[in-house]
Amino acid sequence: GVGSLGTRSEIAAELILHGGTEEQRQHWLPKIASGEILPTAVFTEPNVGSDLGSVGTRAIRDGDVYKVQGNKTWITHAARADMMTLLARSNPDQRGYRGLSMFLAEKPRGTVDDPFPGEGMSGSEIEVLGYRGMKEYEIAFDGFEVGADNLLGGEEGNGFKQLMATFESARIQTAARAVGVAQNAFELGLNYGIERQQFGGAIVRFPRVAGKLAWMAVEIMMARQLTYFAARQKDQGRRCDL
């Protein structure tokens, strides 16, 4: 749960750092860095999943605001967030990736009883089996307004390109969390194998148990080293998604 908070802040910060206007950088980055605001990533839609080129949520310009219409799902920490990095289709005549724009959409922070008090949006929590610290939500937008100044970079149609530039860092951070979860599972399993007694000895001595633990150690080490390698590549300005 705590690690996932960092991922959303990282995505928002990289989007603004690399794609935002100077005014957007000055306004948002200090608040994200200090923890004054909590961002959330609002990309995924029902029946769309990772196919972001098929995003159907629309953001239509109306004077000094964009009016957002559509549905999003699997939005992490959405209720308590203060700002949404919102991917929406600003040009409905352009299909695929070209008609997408990224918005820095402000919203009031919600509560358990009233997760989305902002006008033009509603939603509810999605029950999950694991990762209980990560609260997931589905959101419906019905005329939700975003200021035109909150269009990332000030130009429409760059949303997909801007988003792809951030995913490397987010995936490295997610990989690091996965390695940590796996390491903890391994240590719990190893301790249980040492403490659990059967047939006059610890079950860790049984070949089947020892073999499973050994493969866990090998695969965790591989994942950890690959994560470190990707992080080094990113730090050195090289591609790290290959």
Regions flagged by a language model, labelled:
Residues 176, 207-217:
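Extended, low-aromatic, Leu/Ala- and acidic/polar-enriched alpha-helical coiled-coil segments
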Residues 1-8:
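Short, flexible active-site-proximal loops enriched in glycine and acidic residues
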Residues 3, 24, 30-187, 191, ...:
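FAD-binding core of flavoproteins
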Residues 11, 171, 209-212:
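Hydrophobic alpha-helical transmembrane segments of multi-pass small-molecule transporters/permeases
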Residues 190-204, 217-242:
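C-terminal helix-coil-helix/basic helical segment that borders enzyme active sites and/or dimer interfaces
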